[in-house]
């Protein structure tokens, strides 16, 4: 059981107004360098108005899908892979980042200094530059 397990048995949440809906918006996990106006703008992109009220654009039930361990499958992923973590990520500790990268035949680990879990929100320029540099070094 996880905190989203009840989502599987109930319908997509509905809210009367966009403002009420946005008051519920939170990053999961918490932690970001994005300011309040940036978070609000991000939230606005994640909601939609339907005939019965305001709801999230994503399928609520997707949070409840079970998944197994990926560790045994890593050696079979034979593509170049850049695994990125924010320095302050609450989800992907540095040892796990290194373990994932080491488990991939062509994996490389990269940590973006100062970023939380949502690296693309916290350090978009640094992330884009790192991905571009990584891609430039790949064989054609």
Where are each of the predicted segments found?
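Flexible "cap/lid" loop of the alpha/beta hydrolase fold
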Residues: 1-18
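Glycosyltransferase donor-binding loop in the core domain
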Residues: 13, 89, 116-119
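Residue-level signal for the nucleotide or nucleotide-sugar donor/cofactor binding architecture
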Residues: 16, 92, 122
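An amphipathic alpha-helix signature
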Residues: 18-26
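Hydrophobic "lid"/C-terminal helical patch
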Residues: 25, 127, 131, 135
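Acidic/histidine metal-binding catalytic segments
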Residues: 31-45
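Conserved serine/cysteine hydrolase catalytic core
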Residues: 47-103, 108-111
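Catalytic histidine-centered segment of alpha/beta-hydrolase-like enzymes
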Residues: 112-128
